[in-house]
Amino acid sequence: MSGIDASQLDLIVCSTTTGDHLVPAEACAVAERLGATCPAFDVSAACAGFVFALDVAEGYIARGRAERVLVVAAEQMTRALEWTDRATCVLFGDGAGAAVIEAGGDSPLAVELSTAPDVETLRVPGLVGTSPFKASADSASVLFMNGRRVFKFGVNAICDTVHKLASDAGISVEDIDHFVFHQANERILSQAVKRLGVPDERVVRTLRETGNISSACIPFALDRLASTDALDAGDTIALVGFGAGLDTGGYLLRWK
């Protein structure tokens, strides 16, 4: 879709927490499949990862280190689930999305990255090996989520980040044409939209198609928005991802 060849890429950044490998980086696997020879590495910021990866790409371009960066978000959340836990297994899915970021375009109108340090609310335990020096009660590395805590954090993260993006860009929330939020669950989206007071038709929803596909939610939803007649040149789009860590990433851009 970008009309460029893999040989023209200067960098590949991949956001994933559920890749095919712990080592090497999943971005290296993407580079191999594409036949690209540029540097490639991963960003791990859970469901906020795509926005964090966008900011990394923008930084490389702004410093003149790259002209074209492939940003990928790819997740297989189903491999991290406990399938007897209906509080989590019914929410998640697998998916991927990607974007090519090029020099010469407009910089984002505003960027907001934040962390509210918390490693307990939403987590997947580390490797369970066979070392005799470290016993583990975990039989598998599966996802744990405190749903109530995630709900409260998610609503606040969306609303606070949207207001900060608008303020930094010198516009009002009402001036933002489209909202692409992390698709955690419908309750979080509905409550955030209600609190923000924005028209529901401005908010992209893809949950019924994919479920929660972690960092791939935002590029997938952005692609869905781009394929409709609702998006016009010059429209402003607010991207907000939030997830384990507890990390939040916000990006305000103008569509061309």
Regions found by a protein language model. Give the residues of each.
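Short beta-strand-loop/turn "lid" adjacent to the catalytic site in phosphate-handling enzymes
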Residues: 8-21
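Conserved active-site "lid/cap" helical segment
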Residues: 1-10, 128-177, 188-196, 221, ...
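Condensing-enzyme catalytic core mediating Claisen C-C bond formation in acyl metabolism
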Residues: 85-152, 156, 160, 242, ...
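Short acidic, glycine/serine/threonine-rich loops at helix termini
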Residues: 23-25, 81-85, 248-252
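Flexible, glycine-rich active-site loops centered on histidine and acidic residues
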Residues: 62-96
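Claisen-condensing/thiolase-fold acyl-transfer catalytic domains that form or cleave C-C bonds
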Residues: 18-19, 29-32, 37-39, 45-65, ...
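Short beta-strand segments
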Residues: 15, 44, 69-75, 101-102, ...
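Short glycine-enriched loops at secondary-structure junctions
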Residues: 17-20, 114, 128, 186
